C-alpha cells in the first residue's frame, strides 16, 4: 500500500446511521470531519479574506484547476511558490480536476475521446485540450494538498450505454492520472466515482478505483439536476463501497439538508459555491429558514438577521441595514452576506459533528429541518 500525503483518522461512528466523526491530516494541517469547504474558484473565496475564513472556522478551502490554468496560469503559481503562498493561505487546499467545467464547455460529444477533451475557453473562445496527465500536471504546479483525478461527468439522465462507456473511460483516465502524479509525498490524489443513477455502474466505478489505492475517494455526478431523493439513493448504495480508512468527498453539494443527509450516509467532505453565490443576490440561510433580504418587509426590520447566529454580521448589523446595502449594490453588503452564509454552513457541520458524538444525528436532522422549513409544502432547496 502507498504511503499517502494525507491520512484519515476515524474518531467515532454514530450508532444509528452511517455518519463518521474523524479528521484529515494534510501537509498544511489537520481539519475535522464532516467538513464543508468554501469554494475559492480563482484563488479567492469571493469577497472574503483568508483571515476572515480562518475566523469563521474554514479548515480547508477549494480552488478550481481549470480557471487557474487559464488565469493566471499554473506555471506562474508554481513560480510564486505554490497556491498557498500565492493566496496567503497556510491551511489545506483542495483542487478539482477541471473536468466539470470542461464538460460544461464541450460543444460536441465527439470532442471527448480516449486521449482527452477538446473544448473552447470561456474567456476568449480559443480551442483548448485537457487530458488526465495535463490535469495532474496543473495541480502539481498549484501544489494543493488534495487533488482530483480527471473524470468525465455526464449528466444524470444519460442513457445506460453512454454512462457505462463513460465510467470505463474515467477508470482508465484515473490510472493514467495516478501514473502521472509526480508529487505523491506532499499531495494526495483522489479518484472520482461516477455512474449516474445506475447502481451496477457505481459499483463498477468504485471497484475499479479502490483497486488503484488513491488517497481518498470522491463521489461525482450528483447535484447535477437529479432530485434530492435520487441523490440519497445513489449515496445509499455508493458510500458503503468505499474504504473506511480513506476520506469520502461528495462534490458540489451545499444545501443544508443535503449536507446532513450526506453525513448520515457516511460522507466526510462537501463543497459548493451555493452559500457565496446566493449571498451576492441577498439570499441568506438562517436557523429559521431562507431569507431574501431584498424583500420589502425587511426595510424597517432593525433586528439581527439570525438571532441564533453569533457571526460578525448577525452580532453587528440589522436586516434593514443588510437590505439597504444589497439594494444599493454595496460591496460591504456582499461581504457581510457571504460571511454569514459561510459561517452558517461551517457551524452547521460543527453542530453535526457534535450530534455524531452524542449519537443523536437523526433527532438533530428532524429538529433542524422543522425549524428551517424543509417540512413545509413547496419548501425551497436551500
Curated annotation (Swiss-Prot):
CC cofactor: Zn(2+)
Pfam name, any one: TGT
Pathway: tRNA modification; tRNA-queuosine biosynthesis
An individual GO BP term: tRNA wobble guanine modification
Record-annotated membrane-spanning stretches: none
Catalyzed reaction equations: 7-aminomethyl-7-carbaguanine + guanosine(34) in tRNA = 7-aminomethyl-7-carbaguanosine(34) in tRNA + guanine
GO MF annotations, alphabetized: metal ion binding; tRNA-guanosine(34) queuine transglycosylase activity
SUPFAM superfamilies per UniProt: tRNA-guanine transglycosylase
Active-site annotation: 96, 271
Keywords: Glycosyltransferase, Metal-binding, Queuosine biosynthesis, Transferase, tRNA processing, Zinc
Quaternary structure and interacting proteins, as annotated: Homodimer. Within each dimer, one monomer is responsible for RNA recognition and catalysis, while the other monomer binds to the replacement base PreQ1.
Family: Belongs to the queuine tRNA-ribosyltransferase family.
Known role: Catalyzes the base-exchange of a guanine (G) residue with the queuine precursor 7-aminomethyl-7-deazaguanine (PreQ1) at position 34 (anticodon wobble position) in tRNAs with GU(N) anticodons (tRNA-Asp, -Asn, -His and -Tyr). Catalysis occurs through a double-displacement mechanism. The nucleophile active site attacks the C1' of nucleotide 34 to detach the guanine base from the RNA, forming a covalent enzyme-RNA intermediate. The proton acceptor active site deprotonates the incoming PreQ1, allowing a nucleophilic attack on the C1' of the ribose to form the product.
The name this protein goes by in its record: Queuine tRNA-ribosyltransferase
Native species: Lactococcus lactis subsp. cremoris (strain MG1363)
Gene it is expressed from: tgt
